[in-house]
Amino acid sequence: GVSASFLGEEYREGLQNENERIKALNNIKIELDEIDTYCEERKNNYVKDRNVLKYLLDNSDYAFDSIDNLVQSSPGIGFALNDYREFQPPMNRYNSIINEGTIKFIESDSVKQQLSELHNTLYAYLKSIVDDEKLIQQKLSLYLAENYPKVILLEKYDTEKKTYYNALSKAVNNDEILKALMYTKYRKMGIKNYFLDGYEEKLIELRNRIEKVLINKGAK
């Protein structure tokens, strides 16, 4: 009787652990889908902002037309210079399974390792690059405000894009310091986009691995 009772309890505990395991993996999978959507939005805007700077620095005959196709207003041009975009993917579900200790139910060491790499290592790299860009952006904004206040004041929705572009382009072409600050920000944006691509590759690889585990468990 004791032996049967013990085996029954062991079976129930194993079943409960398996349910917790599937629940944890499903939660991670849901959040990875959310992060994927977030990264696509970030990538589109990161690339757009960098292209605005590219065309301003190029100063080619088609530069304004190219920028005009990218942004809807003068502030859209100014944003690429005077602001930055954060990188804050949704991580509540991951943080919960860490804080609650339910990460222990995930058997696969490779899944746990890739989760840590994505949410700690690669995330830290991206945050560091965004912080660096923020410092450059602050220097750039301050330099513009101190040396080209009229350009700053033109950065509003009722200013024609062409008017704002012409004023900004004139400033850039006649000021090596301004151009150097813009180029530094442009270069940092390129590094950010490179690491975002790597982050997305790791995310997709991890999501595919989790999907296979769930399929093998008959949970999907």
PLM regions: where:
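Long, hydrophobic alpha-helical segments that serve as membrane-spanning/inserting helices
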Residues: 7-220
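Hydrophobic membrane-insertion alpha-helices, especially the h-region
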Residues: 1-6
